[in-house]
Amino acid sequence: MSITIFNRDLKEIYYEKQYKNGQLKFLYNTILGRMLLKLFISTRLFSKINAIFNNNKGSIKKIEPFINEYKIDMSEYEKKEYTSFDDFFTRKILEGKRSFSKEKSHLISPADSKLMVYEIDDDLKMNIKNSIYTVGELLNDEKLSREYKNGTCLIFRLTVDDYHRYCFIDDGSLKYRKVINGRLHTVGPISSKRYKVYSENNREYSVLKTRNFGKVIQIEVGALLVGKIKNHSIKVFKKGDEKGYFCFGGSTIVLLFKEKVIKMDEDILEYSKAGIETKIKMGEKIGETND
């Protein structure tokens, strides 16, 4: 299965194949696969075992084939001898390889990713990867979710070839952070036909008091074979500061804005309305304040 994506830089449509597509079809579309998923693969134990395999020296041999398969441009990253596959996966990008808009009114992307935009309707429901979710289900907090009625939801889907570190979108301070434990499932379209993907996943959200966008909620969501979301202990931050990173696997970031706070760039809006994600980079302008 492939996913249709708009490449904003090249102004063209391309098709992305899903990581380990055949294995996912087996897990979600067969009786034996679903039994394995329920009893073992989607458990914390399996995720921890997988993390151990990706953190040992033997996993280094996986790096070169991975780079070749996903055509990763390693000239963008720091040159170093990686100690494991996970060390490679959480690699840091070279300074200057991502441009951050300095305009206070500009909304930037927190990560290299594929972006979709959703309006939060009167019923506080949003369409996330072909399933319907309320903001309350995502946050596990109905009272907090009501603050975002008629607001905007931005979904940034990171795939295995993306840079898996992410940043703050504005100057501000952390009000509080909450961790929600769940069962791990993949974020792509195959699994979303079978499960409420996000409500089943481990996730962590931060309530941010930002200078230009008010009270923003940023949610990091883990996926199949991802056991860790690593957020730095930062109370006060600047636009573009690193917020954290994901360990191995495709993962997702969700941003929630209150009503009439932001105005998205037209191209992103148009493709989102057509059900097509937009490929963007961390720090790239994707919208602005709705003045």
Swiss-Prot record:
Describe, as the record does, how this protein assembles with itself and its partners.
Heterodimer of a large membrane-associated beta subunit and a small pyruvoyl-containing alpha subunit.
Q: Which residues form the active site?
A: 112 (charge relay system), 251 (charge relay system), 251 (schiff-base intermediate with substrate)
For this protein, what is the EC number?
A: 4.1.1.65
The EC class name is lyase
Instruction: Give the keywords, sorted.
Output: Cell membrane, Decarboxylase, Lipid biosynthesis, Lipid metabolism, Lyase, Membrane, Phospholipid biosynthesis, Phospholipid metabolism, Pyruvate, Zymogen
> What's the protein here called?
Phosphatidylserine decarboxylase proenzyme 2
> Any idea what job this protein has?
Catalyzes the formation of phosphatidylethanolamine (PtdEtn) from phosphatidylserine (PtdSer).
Q: Tell me if DNA-binding is a UniProt keyword of this record.
A: no
The annotated pathway is: Phospholipid metabolism; phosphatidylethanolamine biosynthesis; phosphatidylethanolamine from CDP-diacylglycerol: step 2/2
- Among the Pfam families in the record, one is PS_Dcarbxylase
